[in-house]
Each structure stands twice: as C-alpha cells, then as structure tokens.
Regions:
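Compositionally biased terminal segments of proteins
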Residues: 2-215
C-alpha cells in the first residue's frame, strides 16, 4: 500500500491531455496502481495506434489516447476487447481525472462493434510480433509491431482519409512486399470497389505504383 501511495504521489496531476512517451509510462503506472488498489484480476491489453508507435520507438510524436485492438487471455490467446472490463474502465476514469486526460483516453475504438479490426480479422501472426511491458502484477501491455502498424495505418489512411495515418505510414518506410500484404489484408475488411480505388490511389501517392498494379 505504501508503494502505491508513493507512486500516486510522485505523478503530477498537471499532465496534459496530449500524451508523450513519458506521459504514457506515467499513465500506465498509475493505471496499474489503481488496479492493484482495487485488487482486480490481471488484464492484458494489446495496443495499436499512436501510443504503440511511441512506446516501441517507431515514431517520436504525441497522441491523445491509447487504442486497444485486442485483449490477451491467460492462455496467451487474443480475444475481443468489446466490451472492456468494467473494472478497467473505472480505473481508467480515475486516471483520466488524476492526470487531466481525455475521458476515453483508454478505449477499444479500433475493435468496437461488428466492423472492428478484431472482429473482421487481425493480420496473421500479429501475436508473434508483440512487444510486452509489465506494469505491476495486474497490468500487462502488448504493443503491436511494425508490420502490423503498416497494415493498420494503410487501412486507416484509406478508410478515414486522415493525413496523420499517411504520415505515420511514410515514417515506417514500408517495402513493396509489406505494403502488398497490408493492402490485401485491408481489402478483406472492405471489399467495395470504391475502397480498392482509393487504396490504389494511396499506394501511388506513397510511390509504390507496382503494388497498386498488383492488387
């Protein structure tokens, strides 16, 4: 208990809602402390998006939230994060209040509902490319790897037309082989002709004309 109190006291309550790499570590440590105080079961989060880019050192930037694409069970199998456990959401709300984060700073938006990433199918082998971090006895966080970032970022860049995803994708410097694998995976999530057309345009914009022709 004394350890938890020291951790809580050591973390500033003036943390901005824009999350840096240091902020991310503080948030996870505090979340772990909240779970310990509540004596919850162990939770294992599989995280994608900007926070995973930051945590694994693939990009130096900020983010606004932590995107949970899956949970991992005690048998090391990935399972749906929809819905997230109530005890986790309660602890996350306390962290948001303590650190001044957005209310939904920890969310399952990428895999929420029937059309979510988990529900539609994750890239093959994603579980073998995770980077694990342990925060106390009740919180494990697994960050997705570079190849899976390429898959998700290409899909998001086409689906959402968001320049941030395209910027992240360029920073990952994907090869033709990696982009073709990502493109073919993305087309399993949206089989429409319109999506394929925009996907080809995006690949050409990235300078990968041959990939656009191959898919």
């Amino acid at each position: 208990m004394l350890f938890i109190v020291r951790v809580l006291g050591a973390i500033s309550n003036n943390m901005p809602s824009i999350i840096t790499q240091d902020d991310l570590e503080k948030a996870f440590r505090l979340l772990a402390g909240r779970l310990d105080l509540a004596q919850t079961e162990t939770v294992r989060l599989v995280v994608c998006g900007g926070s995973a880019l930051i945590a694994t050192g693939l990009r130096q930037r900020t983010t606004k939230d932590v995107d949970i694409v899956a949970l991992m069970n005690s048998s090391a199998h990935l399972v749906s994060p929809d819905p997230l456990p109530d005890f986790l959401l309660a602890a996350a709300k306390q962290v948001a209040r303590d650190l001044g984060l957005f209310d939904n700073w920890l969310n399952n938006a990428p895999s929420s509902g029937e059309g979510g990433l988990y529900q539609m199918g994750l890239p093959q082998g994603i579980g073998e490319r995770l980077t694990a971090r342990e925060y106390g006895s009740r919180l494990m966080v697994y960050f997705i790897g570079r190849l899976d970032q390429i898959h998700f970022k290409l899909y998001a860049a086409v689906d959402q037309r968001d320049g941030t995803h395209l910027t992240d994708l360029r920073a990952l410097k994907p090869t033709d082989i990696e982009l073709e694998a990502a493109a073919r995976w993305a087309m399993t999530h949206d089989v429409s002709d319109g999506f394929k057309m925009v996907l080809k345009e995006t690949l050409r914009e990235l300078g990968h004309e041959s990939v656009a022709e191959n898919i």
